[in-house]
A protein has these predicted regions:
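Conserved, mostly hydrophobic/aromatic
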Residues: 90, 148, 183
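Extended substrate/RNA-proximal surfaces in nucleic-acid metabolism proteins
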Residues: 5-115, 193-213
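Short loop-to-alpha-helix "cap/lid" segments that border enzyme active sites
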Residues: 126-132
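Short active-site-adjacent structural elements
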Residues: 123-125, 153-157, 187
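Short acidic/histidine-rich active-site segments
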Residues: 141-157
């Protein structure tokens, strides 16, 4: 998207370096972008106007919320052709996938990893996004759960409760993998396992809910 990338990466690196030299906590920060998927994404990466996560092979991208890109598969193929592993941010929030949840399966079959938002499980983005997030999680179609926080807000105090609920939903081993093990593998630029998944199925009530405009 023209004009979408406004972050000065050199400035961000400088800020990060200053924080690291002056910090008085054990919090570790890593540089990376959540990148809007565009046809010239590989050019932006080569020009350092967009970067992978922590200078690894993993690239976090997002889609428009209202219109499904026509050439999304071509753009994903181009990313992978450059040796990068695409991670789709907050897939549960793209309502144009709700009627055909097999789209998520096709992404994962192509090697795309999916990163869900903590806030979605708490209803922050509406009941449909919450239901979709739960379905993706239960179907083994999620590889990360993250905050998607771009600025200070009220999400952090809610995360322990959300994690408790998620542990009850699918088990603490699974949640630990999505919030701790896989993110650490990413930071080390190691491969992340894509496990066997099951098909997403709706009951009649869920289907009516997800098909509404």
């Amino acid at each position: 998207m023209e004009g979408y990338f406004t972050t000065d990466l050199e400035d961000r690196q400088k800020i990060l370096s200053e924080f690291e030299s002056n910090k008085n906590s054990n919090i570790e920060l890593y540089l990376g972008n959540e990148i809007f998927l565009t046809s010239n994404l590989t050019e932006l990466l080569k020009e350092k106007k967009a970067i992978p996560l922590n200078n690894t092979k993993y690239i976090l991208f997002e889609l428009p919320f209202n219109i499904k890109p026509m050439n999304i598969n071509d753009m994903i193929f181009e990313i992978q052709s450059n040796g990068l592993v695409p991670i789709l941010a907050h897939p549960e929030r793209y309502s144009y996938f709700y009627k055909n949840p097999e789209n998520y399966e096709e992404f994962v079959d192509k090697g795309v990893l999916l990163q869900l938002n903590f806030g979605s499980f708490d209803g922050q983005y509406g009941s449909r996004a919450k239901l979709m997030a739960e379905k993706l999680l239960k179907s083994n179609l999620a590889h990360f759960i993250a905050t998607d926080v771009h600025r200070p807000n009220t999400l952090y105090p809610r995360i322990p409760r959300i994690i408790k609920n998620l542990n009850e939903l699918v088990g603490d081993e699974k949640i630990n993998k999505l919030t701790n093990i896989n993110p650490n593998l990413l930071l080390q630029n190691k491969d992340i396992e894509i496990e066997k998944f099951s098909h997403i199925k709706w009951n009649l009530f869920e289907k009516m809910k997800m098909n509404k405009k």
